[in-house]
Amino acid sequence: MFELNNFDALQIGLASPEKIREWSRGEVKKPETINYRTLKPERDGLFCERIFGPTKDWECHCGKYKRVRYKGIVCDRCGVEVTKSKVRRERMGHIELAAPVSHIWYFKGIPSRMGLMLDMSPRSLEKVLYFASYIVIDPKETPLLKKQLLNEKEYREAIENYGEEGFVAGMGAESVQKLLEEIDLNQVSKELKEALKTSTGQKKIRLIRRLEAVESFRKSSNRPDWMIIDVIPVIPPDLRPMVQLDGGRFATSDLNDLYRRVINRNNRLKKLLDLGAPDIIVRNEKRMLQEAVDALIDNGRRGRPVTGPGNRPLKSLSDMLKGKQGRFRQNLLGKRVDYSGRSVIVVGPELKMYQCGLPKEMALELFKPFVMKKLVQGGLSHNIKSAKRMVERVQSEVWDVLEEVISDHPVLLNRAPTLHRLGIQAFQPVLVEGRAIKLHPLVCTAYNADFDGDQMAVHLPLSVEAQAEARFLMLAAHNILKPSDGKPVCVPTQDMVLGSYYLTLDKENAIGEGRIFSSPEEAIMAYQIGDIDIHAHIKVRISKEVDGEEVCGIIDCTPGKLIFNESIPQDLGFVDRSVPGNEVKLEVDFLINKSSLGKLINKCYMKHGPTKTSIMLDKIKEKGYHYSTIGAITVSTSDMVVPEAKKRLLAETDVEVNKIDKMYRRGFISEDERYERVIEKWTKTTDLVADELMKNLDRFNPIFMMADSGARGSKSQIKQLAGMRGLMANPSGKIIELPIRASFREGLDVSEYFISTHGARKGNADTALKTADSGYLTRRLVDVSQDVIVREEDCGSKEGFEISEIREGNEIIEPLSERLTGRYSAEDIIDPNTGEILVKKEEYIDGEKAEEVEKSGVKKIKIRSVFTCKSKHGVCAKCYGMNMATAEKINIGESVGIIAAQSIGEPGTQLTMRTFHTGGVAGSDITQGLPRVEELFEARKPKGLAIVSEINGTIRIDETKKKRTVVVIGETEEISYDIPFGSRLKVSNGDVISAGDEITEGSVNPHDVLRIKGPNGVKNYLLSEVQKVYRLQGVDINDKHLEVVVRQMTRKIKIEESGDTEFLPGTMVDIFDFQEENAKAEEEGKETAKGRITLLGITKAALATDSFLSSASFQETTRVLTDAAIKGKVDPLLG
C-alpha cells in the first residue's frame, strides 16, 4: 500500500511519456470491461486484474491461490499478483497510441500555450492538428517558409515543383511534435528579450506572453513536446467503477465509455497502419483518435460534446475536478464524517451554559465503541463481540456505562449554514429522554437558531487532542464574544430581557412604599409573603466588608433590584466604589434593557473572564424567565390605544397637501417639487402621530414594555399597530404619495391592504437573493485570505498607518476610540493641550486608553496595522493587535484570514439589496448594501461615478448655456472637468481641494484613488467605504478584518521594467518577492526592476495566489492547473 501523509509541498508538472509508462502496471489493449457471463474482468481490458490488481482480497483471477499466506505471489496461470483489492484504487495502466495526439488543455486554453511556443495562431494550429492543412517542417532549399500552412492543392503543386524529397511537410500532432522538439528554449528566450527592447503596443504584449510561456518551460524543466501525448495514462479502475444494479444491469462511470472510444479507435488505427491503408483513411482515423482523446480529457471544450444515453454530455477527466461536485470541493475540502447524528432542537432553559441535552439513543449510537470498551474493561462482558451484542440489545447495564463515558467527553454541535466560527461549539452532553437535542437558550444568537423545527448536527471529537481542543477552545462558555467586533454574542433575548426589565422597574405608590428593612434578605422575604410589591420604593440597610472593615449604610431601592443584583458581581465599575458612601450601593441601580445587559456582560467579561461571566449569564437567564412568567405580560387589542390627536393631524395635513396641489396646478412649482413636498408633509405627520402615541402609552403597558426593553418589537411597529402605517413604496421602490392612514388596530381598507402587499413581496424576494449572494461573497473572501495566519510575534515594521475617525457628512460612522482599541501605537501619542505623552510608541492601547486619547482631542494617530506588516506569509501579532474573540493579545498560529472573511461575510445577509433612489431631479442611484460591498471588494468601476480631482488647487466653476465646467487651478497647471447634466456638485467657487477629492457626488473608482493617492490612499478608501455600508446597517465589524482582506487585494506589483532581474515585464509578482529580488540586484550592482502596486478584486486576487491548489479549488480549475503544470509550480501548503 502506498501511504503518504507527511509531505511539506506539492509540485505539479507535465508528464513525459516515460513517466506515464513508469507509473503504469501494464498496457490496456482491449476495450472490454467485464465478462457478461462470469462477471469477472476481461484480461487486458479496462478492468484487467493483471494490470490493476485482484478484485477480491488475497485471491488471483483463476482461483489457484486463495488466502493471505500466498501474499505477494504472482500466479503462474493468470499472472495476477495476490494482494489486497485496495490496490485497484492506486494502480494505473496506459494506452500506447498508434499516433501522437495533442493535449487539448495546452492547445485550446486561453492563451493557447502550444500556439505561443510555436508562434502560431490557434486557428492555424487547429487546421494542422485536425488534418485540414499541411505544415512545412523543413523547407530545405525551396522558397517555402518554415511553419507555412499548405492546403491539399498547394501541397500537391509543391511536390510537383520540388519533388517529394525537396521539402518536409506533414499534418496532425506528429508534425507539431517535431516542431516542438526543435525549439531551443534558451535561444528563443534570448531572442525574445532582445526583441522586447524595441517593440511597443500589441506586438509587445504578444512578445511578453510568448516570453512568459518560454520562461515557464525553461525554468520548470518541462519539455514543450510533452504537450503532445504518445501514451495515455489510464486511471485506477476503482476511481471509475462499474457496479451492478438490482435489475442485473450495469451502471458505469462515464470515463469508461470515453476510454473505450479511445481504445477502439486506437486499435482500428493500428490495424489500418499494418494493412498499409490509403493515406486518406488513416488520416480520418487519426483525426477521430484525436477527437476521442480530447473528449476524454475535456469533453465539450472543442466541438459538440460526446453524449451518452438521453443526450447527456459525458463527464470527462476535467469535469471530475471542476465545480461544487468536483474532486476539490466534494472530497478534498469537505467530507462527510462518521460519529455524527442530527435531530430537531428544543429549548433547554434548565441547562448550564456549557451543557446540551443529548437524546439517549443518539448518545448510545455515537459513543458505541467507547461503551463497548468500558463494558469489557469493567468485566461486564468477556469480549468485544459480546459487548457489541449488549449495546445492540440495549441491556440495562449499558446506560450506567454510557453515563460514565459521557461524563467528560465534549460533543460538537453545528447548525447549518455555518457562517462564522460560532456555528460550531462544544458542549458537555447531558442525557435526555425523547429524541430531540436540547439547546441552551443563550447560544441561539450565535447559531442563529430558533425552535420552530430547526435541526442541528452532533459530532464527536475522538482523539485526546480533539477533545482537549473542544474543551478549551470551543466550549460554549468560552465563546462569549463575537470574533467580528468583540462585543458579547451571548446577550439574553426576549423573555429573559423582559423579565430583567420587569424586575428593575419601579412604581409610585406601590404596596409597602417607604418601608425600611434591616437586610436584603428580610426585604426579599417580605416580597415573597406578599407584604410589599416588587416595584415598591423601599429603604434597606446593607452591610459589607471592605478591606477587612465592616461598612454599613441604608440605600433606596426596590425588591426587584435587590433580587436582580444577587446574580451580578458587585465590582463591575457601574458605581465608583472609591467615593465614600458608595461602598454599599447596588451595582445595577437602573432600568435594565437589552443594550444595558450587553454592557453588563461586556464589563463582567473584561473584569472576571469567561467562567464567571457564564455563571452570571445563567443566573440572569433563570431570573429573567421566572419573572417574565410572574409578570404575566400579555398582549390584547385594548393595549393599543389610538391617540386622540390623530384625526386632527390628518385633517390638517389634508389641507396642506391641497394647498401644494393648488400651487402646482397654477404652475408655481414643478411636478417633482410637488411630489417631494407631499412626501415630506406625510412623513412629518406620521412621526407626529407616533410621538402622540408614545406620550399616551403607560409605562406598564405590555406592548410598550416589550419594545422599550428591547425584548421584541420596536417603536415603528407600535406606530403601525396603533398610530398610522404611513407611506409605502411601490414595487420599483418609489414612494406612493398616498399614505396608509389606518393602523392595524383600526384595520386597513382594500386599497391600503393592496399597497402594503408590494413591500412584503419584495422583502421576501430580496431575502432569497441576498442569502445566495452573501454566501458567494463569503466564499470569495475565504479564498482570498485563507493563508493569512499569525506567523511571528513582531515583524519589526517601522512605518505605521494613519487613522482618524470615519465620517459621512456630519455623522461619525466610526469613532477614533473604536479604531484604536486593541492596537499597538506606531508613535508617541501626545496630548495636544498639555503636551504629556498619553501612549508611548509600541505600547498596547486598551479600551480605557483609547477613550482617554479620544477625549484629549487628538485627531490623527499612527498605529501598527496589518497594512504595513512586513511578514512575508501571514501577519505578525503586533500589527494585528487584539484577538476580538478573547479580548487578549492574539496567539501565533491563529488563522486570522478565515476569521476576517467570516466576520465580513456573516453579516452580509443583514445588508440590504436595494439601490436607494436619491431625491432630487436627476438623482443618480447610489449603490448601497451588499452590492456596494461586492463592488468595493471586486474593485470594480462603480455605478454613479464621481469625478475626482487629479491635483491640489482651487476651484473655479464656469457655466455656459450648454454645459458646466469645473476648473481646478493648481500651482503649475490647471485641469478642467466637464460636468455631465444632472450631476450634483460637491464643491463651490473658490474651494480649496486636494488631489483625490470628489468634485461631483457619487462613488469614486478605486483604481483612480490608487493612481492619485497611492497605495495607502486606496487602502484607506476601501476600508472606510466598506465600513460605511456596514455601520449604516447597524453592523459593527472591526477594522482589522477589513485590513486583512484589503491587504490581500494590494499585494501584487505589476512589473513595468524588468532591469536585470528574473521578472518579465507585464507580469504580476508578490510585493515581498519584488523587494527581495530588487535588494539582491542592488547588492550585486545590477539594475533593479520597476513596477507599481496594482489593485486586484478578490476573485482575481484569490486566483493570483501563490498556491495553485487554493486557486484550483476556487474557480476556473482547468485554467489554473494548465498554467501551474507548465510552470512546474510548487505549492508550499501554507495556510
UniProtKB/Swiss-Prot annotation:
Its EC number is 2.7.7.6. Keywords: DNA-directed RNA polymerase, Magnesium, Metal-binding, Nucleotidyltransferase, Transcription, Transferase, Zinc. GO terms for cellular component: DNA-directed RNA polymerase complex. Its cofactor is Mg(2+); Zn(2+). The keyword Transcription applies. Binds 1 Mg(2+) ion per subunit. Binds 2 Zn(2+) ions per subunit. GO terms for biological process: DNA-templated transcription. Zn(2+) 2 binds at C795, C869, C876, C879. Zn(2+) 1 binds at C60, C62, C75, C78. Mg(2+) binds at D450, D452, D454. It catalyses: RNA(n) + a ribonucleoside 5'-triphosphate = RNA(n+1) + diphosphate. InterPro entries: DNA-dir_RpoC_beta_prime, DNA-dir_RpoC_beta_prime_bact, RNA_pol_asu, RNA_pol_N, RNA_pol_Rpb1_1, RNA_pol_Rpb1_3, RNA_pol_Rpb1_3_sf, RNA_pol_Rpb1_4. One of its GO terms (molecular function) is zinc ion binding. The RNAP catalytic core consists of 2 alpha, 1 beta, 1 beta' and 1 omega subunit. When a sigma factor is associated with the core the holoenzyme is formed, which can initiate transcription. Belongs to the RNA polymerase beta' chain family. DNA-dependent RNA polymerase catalyzes the transcription of DNA into RNA using the four ribonucleoside triphosphates as substrates. This is DNA-directed RNA polymerase subunit beta'. It comes from Clostridium tetani (strain Massachusetts / E88).
